[in-house]
């Protein structure tokens, strides 16, 4: 769900709240990416996520305040059926694979199909090849991964949670894309469009003045 709040400050002063979900197989490093981004922490020991965990991050991008609600989902097969519960109303999805594990890349394709089926083309997709610190053990070709990402309307990124590479760029770019999508929805609403895609994502404009603040949608209220 995305909420854009604006008072008298115009577009530059808008505040946006976005929901981002991380998907991928177990052991690809989803939790490590989130912890590195939100808390600048890294643990060499494998961290198993059970069901889903939730972290928040606040940013300022070109004068626009952004609140991110980041959902880190479990990768184990037995939790896959719970996926729709967590990625419902998401504005962005980060689909992570391990560059040393071809099967984890193939599983990303299944997630893409499911997201497109459930959320359509409005959700911003990022396909991420993690663990580039293990480049010598790579089993997924860069060309194949980038070609696939382009074919499904996603952007491809390379990251290393261990070395803290590519993570800031990943989230910054995703935020910019989600802002652009929200602005398109706002313009469509201003032109009288019924904007079914925006309604499905819960995009709304909120008066940012103190007397008109809404108490709902508190997914980014902590962190």
Curated annotation (Swiss-Prot):
InterPro entries the record matches? P-loop_NTPase, Rab21, Small_GTP-bd, Small_GTPase
Q: What is its main location?
A: endoplasmic reticulum
| Lipid-modified residues, S-geranylgeranyl cysteine kind | 219-220
- Where, per the database record, does this protein carry Cysteine methyl ester? 220
- Which top-rank group of organisms is this from? Eukaryota
Q: Which Pfam families match?
A: Ras
User: What reaction does this catalyse?
Assistant: GTP + H2O = GDP + phosphate + H(+)
The residues the record assigns to binding Mg(2+) are 31, 49, 72
Q: Give the residue interval(s) assigned to the motif Switch 2.
A: 74-92
One GO BP annotation is: Rab protein signal transduction
Where does the motif Switch 1 lie? Answer: 41-54
Q: What EC numbers are recorded for this enzyme? A: 3.6.5.2
GO annotations of cellular component type: cleavage furrow; early endosome membrane; endoplasmic reticulum membrane; Golgi membrane; neuron projection
Which prosthetic group or cofactor does it need?
Answer: Mg(2+)
One of the entry's Gene Ontology molecular-function terms is: GDP binding
User: Subcellular localization, per the record?
Assistant: Endoplasmic reticulum membrane; Golgi apparatus, trans-Golgi network; Golgi apparatus membrane; Early endosome membrane
Q: How is its activity regulated?
A: Regulated by guanine nucleotide exchange factors (GEFs) including ANKRD27 and RABGEF1, which promote the exchange of bound GDP for free GTP. Regulated by GTPase activating proteins (GAPs) which increase the GTP hydrolysis activity. Inhibited by GDP dissociation inhibitors (GDIs).
Q: Which residues does GTP bind? A: 26, 29-32, 43-44, 46, 48-49, 75, 130-131, 133, 161-162
For this UniProt record, the keywords arranged alphabetically read as follows:
Acetylation, Cell projection, Cytoplasmic vesicle, Endoplasmic reticulum, Endosome, Golgi apparatus, GTP-binding, Hydrolase, Lipoprotein, Magnesium, Membrane, Metal-binding, Methylation, Nucleotide-binding, Prenylation, Protein transport, Transport
> What does UniProt say about this protein's domains?
Switch 1, switch 2 and the interswitch regions are characteristic of Rab GTPases and mediate the interactions with Rab downstream effectors. The switch regions undergo conformational changes upon nucleotide binding which drive interaction with specific sets of effector proteins, with most effectors only binding to GTP-bound Rab.
Self-association state and partner proteins as the record states: Interacts with the cytoplasmic tail of integrins ITGA1, ITGA2, ITGA5, ITGA6, ITGA11 and ITGB1; this interaction is dependent upon its GDP/GTP cycle. Interacts with ANKRD27. Interacts (active GTP-bound form) with TMED10; the interaction is indirect and regulates TMED10 abundance and localization at the Golgi.
Spell out the family assignment given in the record's similarity comment: Belongs to the small GTPase superfamily. Rab family.
- Describe its function: The small GTPases Rab are key regulators of intracellular membrane trafficking, from the formation of transport vesicles to their fusion with membranes. Rabs cycle between an inactive GDP-bound form and an active GTP-bound form that is able to recruit to membranes different sets of downstream effectors directly responsible for vesicle formation, movement, tethering and fusion. RAB21 is involved in membrane trafficking control. Regulates integrin internalization and recycling, but does not influence the traffic of endosomally translocated receptors in general.
Protein name as catalogued: Ras-related protein Rab-21
Organism encoding this protein:
Canis lupus familiaris (Dog)
């Amino acid at each position: 769900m995305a909420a854009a709040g604006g008072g008298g400050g115009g577009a530059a002063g808008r505040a946006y709240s976005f929901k981002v979900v991380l998907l991928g197989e177990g052991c690809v490093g989803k939790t490590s990416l989130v912890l590195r981004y939100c808390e600048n922490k890294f643990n060499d020991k494998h961290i198993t996520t059970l069901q889903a965990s939730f972290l928040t991050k606040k940013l300022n991008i070109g004068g626009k305040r952004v609140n991110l609600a980041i959902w880190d989902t479990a990768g184990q097969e037995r939790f896959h059926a719970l996926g729709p519960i967590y990625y419902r109303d998401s504005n962005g999805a980060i689909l992570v694979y391990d560059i040393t594990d071809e099967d984890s890349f193939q599983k990303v394709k299944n997630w893409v199909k499911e997201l497109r089926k459930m959320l359509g083309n409005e959700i911003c997709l990022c396909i991420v090849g993690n663990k580039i610190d293990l480049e010598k053990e790579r089993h997924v070709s860069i060309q194949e991964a980038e070609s696939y990402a382009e074919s499904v309307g996603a952007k491809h990124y390379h990251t290393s949670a261990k070395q803290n590479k590519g993570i800031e760029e990943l989230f910054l770019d995703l935020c910019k894309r989600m802002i652009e999508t929200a602005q398109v929805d706002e313009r469509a609403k201003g032109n009288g469009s019924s904007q079914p895609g925006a309604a499905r994502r819960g995009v709304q404009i909120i008066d940012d003045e103190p007397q008109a603040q809404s108490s709902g949608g508190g997914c980014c209220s902590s962190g």
